[in-house]
Amino acid sequence: MYVLQNAFPYRRMGRILAVLFAIFAVLASFGMGNMTQGNSIAEALAVTFGVDRTVTGLVIGIFTILVILGGIDKIARVTEYLVPCMAVFYLFGTGMVIFTHFHNLPSGILQILCGAFCPEAMAGGSIGFLCSGRQAMRYGVSRGVFSNEAGLGAAGISAACADTPDAVRQGYISMTGVFIDTIVICSLTGLAIASSGMLGQRDAQGELLNGTALMIAVFSATFGRAGEWMLALSIALFAFATIIAWEYQGEKAFEYLAGNSRRTGWYRLCYGMFAFFGAVCSLEAVWDFSDICNGLMAVPNLLAVVMLSQAVSYTHLTLPTKLEV
């Protein structure tokens, strides 16, 4: 928010954009950072263990409030343990799926390429784009943003609390998040689906498997019932860590709007309640709300990125930084 406030030559314009960004960040924290994650946890546990969504929502809401009441130190400690655990679980699982079905990998990749570039798909995609191009772009961009949050400016809020004297070094470290999320995690997910042979399979109702149900089928085909448990646990850890991290980002935006930190208790309470609502609401409503919030949040941040591009280039060239691994 303060970057936006000071980035523009006209301070009043910067202040307006900073306030708008803070408002949209608070809304996005309830949407993408909270409700969609709670919905993913509830779906995974319902499909795998048959747990009622209301029960899952209550547990998520209670645990969220208990963690965030401890402040940034408690949030940092929880995510410090959750993130490595979820990464190891998921990377191990997808790696084993690819290794076990490695002989199917070439045909699986070929199936993806043929499905994307065959004449029927190209004709259908072209007609669909001509008829509803904006909707096609909307889904493509929104899912990409949901994957790595690039362009939203949310990660900068968390990076700002890092104890480092060098902004360039911190910027390099923050950039790795997009690479890990999209190139590593998403690529392994796609390769696991391609090699498992579950791509294009249908459920008992005749519907194509997709999303969480597809990945559960992929893990189940390799590990059996244990694979379903492994994936459900991975999704729960991924999603809960995201809920906790986004709470801090939304709280800082709320604090900027309120002018002090005394009123953040109301935000924390509402945040825990929305985690419950996300678990019990329909998936379509949750996604629509999240997409709107993400789009609104990105606009002022991207304006600041353009305005500060020369300053960033100058800082990068004049202040070389050695990254210590």
Show the residue positions of the predicted features:
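Flexible loop linkers connecting adjacent transmembrane helices
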Residues: 1-11, 199, 203-222, 248-257
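Helix-loop-helix module between adjacent transmembrane segments
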Residues: 5-39, 43-67, 233-243, 262
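Select transmembrane alpha-helical segments in multipass membrane proteins
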Residues: 12-27, 58, 123-147, 184-186, ...
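Membrane-interface alpha-helices at helix entry/exit sites of multi-pass transporters
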Residues: 12-19, 165-178, 261-266
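Membrane-interface loop-to-helix entry segments
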Residues: 21, 38-45, 51-60, 64-114, ...
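Helix-loop junctions at the membrane interface of multi-pass solute transporters
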Residues: 67, 144-149, 155-167, 174-178
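Extracellular/periplasmic helix-exit of transmembrane alpha-helices
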Residues: 93-111, 122-128, 162, 176, ...
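Conserved small/polar residues in nucleotide/adenosyl-binding loops
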Residues: 315-321
